[in-house]
Amino acid sequence: MDSTFHELGISQTLIETLNALHINKPTKIQQISIPQFLSEKNLIVHSPTGTGKTAAFAIPIIEKLLKEDQTAKPTLVIAPTRELVEQIKTTFSNIAKNKKLRIISLIGGVPAWKQIKKIKTNPQIIVGTMGRIMDLLERKAIHFSDLEHLIIDEVDLMLDRGFKKQIFNLLEQINSFKQIAVYSASYNQEAINIAKQITNNGIFIGSPEFNKDANTNNDKLIKQFVCYLFSDQKKQALYSLIKTAQVKSIIVFCDTKKLVDDLHVFLRKNELRTFALHGDKKQFIRERNLKIFANTKQPTILVTTDLIGRGIHVEAIDMVINYSACLNLEAYINRMGRTGRNNHKGTCVTFCTSQEKKVFLKMVEKITDNRIAECKQMEIKLIPLKNKAKTKKGGISLDCVQKIYANAKPYDRNKRVPLASDLFKSRMRQPEKAMQKQKIHDNDWQSNM
């Protein structure tokens, strides 16, 4: 039987704030973890993407601050990325609205002196990246003699980014804390071992029901597709998919920063409103691009690495495209989890080469009862690139290209239909008059199958 926030020990004042944020009832992870948190137990929480993990620790922390003296010892929350830190800070700020709590974020890419000034206001809640926190400790600009709570979010990503040593260094610099809790959307064995060690074998909260909730939601709200392509066909397929889909918001995931920049330029040249996001971008650019994408009313594309694959909440994402196939199950779930949120239907499309097919299908079978559909069922029409469909001396005109593609069949991997970029290259070598003599018609597309 589901519990209410009141039954979990949350005050009416805070419940009213939650209701104003359209948080009317606790998720399963919140139902189980909040009472344990309020009892000051050390916790190890496994909570997949989209199950309300951030609010699961933000709500009880704010509840305790409202009941206790607000000059009490501070809470420190550590997260692996700047974007996730800002997202967590926003969650705290929204839930603590009009409660006069001081909440600050400490991240790289922002002048340290500005953050030192904020530290001097004696904030009750500090959210930061490990790198900036350790930097400020070395400068002696901040100290943690005592903490109320220490929260480590997405601990597996922290370890993946090489912060194991820093985690233990941080613990050595904290004289005492009432409570420590570790949260993550996924745990490998190393993450489990570290979590047990730093929480002194804290209470583990995780259940197949949480995964079931997430996966059932995905099955109902998110349509999954796979497109089997050669690597050199992906750009044209991406452009065609975006133009055919005609949706407002799309996230395109890539496996390298260089590829993000490359696709950003490619889509911009083809007159698509696109923004790029990765770790090498300056902080103000990252914040600006994410803010524009989150609040835009125009069709917009965000090309990114896994930087926002987890923890970043942008509502009503219509489509996720894995331009680089994701062969890690947890990462795939996290990417897919950017869409299908708050009962908003979404689509997840993965571009997959023949070499990746077997591994990808085996991976996806673990989270869906149905075989993943192929892109040909989406009726994607191949559309010529705008930036290449220009008349060149001895080349091909836009009109001629439009004739070739006017009635192109949906992409069919079994027949290995050449995509527009390949066909265009082959035609570029032929003068337009010669093509007219050959009487190229729509069925010329079929002859290339």
UniProtKB/Swiss-Prot annotation:
Keywords: ATP-binding, Helicase, Hydrolase, Nucleotide-binding, RNA-binding. CDD domains: DEADc, SF2_C_DEAD. GO terms for molecular function: ATP binding; ATP hydrolysis activity; RNA helicase activity; RNA strand annealing activity. A motif (DEID box) lies at residues 153-156. A motif (Q motif) lies at residues 3-31. It catalyses: ATP + H2O = ADP + phosphate + H(+). InterPro entries: DEAD/DEAH_box_helicase_dom, DEAD_box_RNA_helicase, Helicase_ATP-bd, Helicase_C-like, P-loop_NTPase, RNA_helicase_DEAD_Q_motif. Residues 233-383 form the Helicase C-terminal domain. GO terms for biological process: response to cold. The keyword Nucleotide-binding applies. GO terms for cellular component: cytosol. The keyword DNA damage does not apply. PROSITE patterns: HELICASE_ATP_BIND_1, HELICASE_CTER, Q_MOTIF. This is Probable ATP-dependent RNA helicase MG425. It comes from Mycoplasma genitalium (strain ATCC 33530 / DSM 19775 / NCTC 10195 / G37) (Mycoplasmoides genitalium).
